[in-house]
């Protein structure tokens, strides 16, 4: 990140989307709102070029490998069906992932108003 820093603050769009996902996710998702308020984005970048991000929560260790989905929604980007989910690992808020369902994973995060509940991904 800037000046060699390994973490940066969430952008307003990232924070808004993550907050919305936690508010509309699984029953345990709301329990992660406090962690989101202390989260930063790591320097990790997905090699595919998508907009996925990883979190580092202040006063918590790095989240171990693993995915516990807290919220999972779908949206359309440039005519392709895509998905976005926020997840934790071992009780630590870990990241937000975008993925392609009917095409490539999008290089941008969706706006919450464009999300709908994830339907079956079978084509």
Map each language-model feature to its residues.
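N-terminal domain-onset segments
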Residues: 1-72, 108-123
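Short, compact, well-ordered microdomains
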Residues: 75-123
């Amino acid at each position: 990140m800037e000046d060699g820093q390994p973490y940066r603050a969430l952008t307003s769009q990232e924070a808004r989307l993550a907050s919305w996902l936690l508010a509309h996710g699984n029953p345990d998702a709301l329990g992660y709102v406090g962690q989101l308020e202390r989260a930063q984005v790591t320097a990790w970048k997905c090699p595919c070029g998508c907009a996925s991000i990883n979190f580092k929560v202040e006063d918590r260790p790095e989240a171990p490998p693993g995915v516990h989905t807290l919220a999972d929604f779908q949206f359309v980007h440039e005519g392709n069906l895509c998905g976005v989910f926020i997840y934790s690992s071992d009780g630590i808020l870990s990241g937000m992932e975008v993925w392609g369902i009917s095409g490539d994973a999008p290089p941008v995060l969706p706006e919450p108003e464009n999300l709908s509940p994830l339907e079956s991904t079978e084509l």
